[in-house]
Amino acid sequence: MRLTIFGASGQTGLHLVAQALELGHNVTAFVRDPASFAPRHANLDIVVGDVGVADDVASVINGQDVVLLALGVKMGVADQVCTIATAHVVPAMQQFGVRRLINIGGMGTGPARNQLSAFGKFVAGGLRLLDRHAFRDKESQEVLIRNSDLDWINVCPPWLTNGPRTGVYRFGCDLRPPVTAKISRADVADFMLKQIIDPTFVGKDPILYY
């Protein structure tokens, strides 16, 4: 399939690119700084652009099958990059008839937050106080996705690690993860790529952890 990955040079994005290529997909990696992106492959197209420019975003969505958003937020930075990017991604997908959108959300925002224990919600609230900009950015992004008519899936991991891909983890919308729950970025990528044709979680916010 033809995949476009935003945030391809990020920690999870790099796993998405590598695993997608292993699976035989044709990958378009959208990056701002090509110097920060080392992978090279015959089925990899590296496009340099700015998620804040609608035409840049649209140029890598036309003709694709699936869009994956692996955009991260920077602590203490109020640039709203996730919201701005998604505000361009959604209409471009609608314009070109690309249906499947898979996003990395989080346990502290959206419906997934309701699955946290009382203590988990307390911890999430504390993190929100420490970095309200990041939480607001992800929340605004998820609202844009939820309000679209796309076949979206909002993947909600807890604490992320740099551990290996195992392919073995819990996932579902009704899980109640402990506050110590974690999962590797490699396994988040593994799960996301399994959603590109699976309809199980369309319009939902699956949680995954070990």
Regions found by a protein language model. Give the residues of each.
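Conserved beta-loop-beta element that borders a ligand/cofactor-binding pocket
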Residues: E142-G163
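N-terminal Rossmann-fold cofactor-binding loop
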Residues: F30-A35, D50-V51
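Substrate-positioning beta->alpha
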Residues: V81-T86, D137, V155, I183-L193, ...
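Conserved Rossmann-fold cofactor-binding substructure of NAD(P)-dependent oxidoreductases
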Residues: D45-D65
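Glycine/proline-rich active-site loop of Rossmann-fold NAD(P)-dependent oxidoreductases
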Residues: P111, P164-Y169, Q195-K204
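Conserved catalytic-site region of short-chain dehydrogenase/reductase
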Residues: M107-R113, L160-G163
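N-terminal Rossmann NAD(P)H-binding glycine-rich loop of SDR-like oxidoreductase domains
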Residues: L3-L23
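NAD(P)-cofactor binding segment of oxidoreductase domains
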Residues: K74-L101, S140
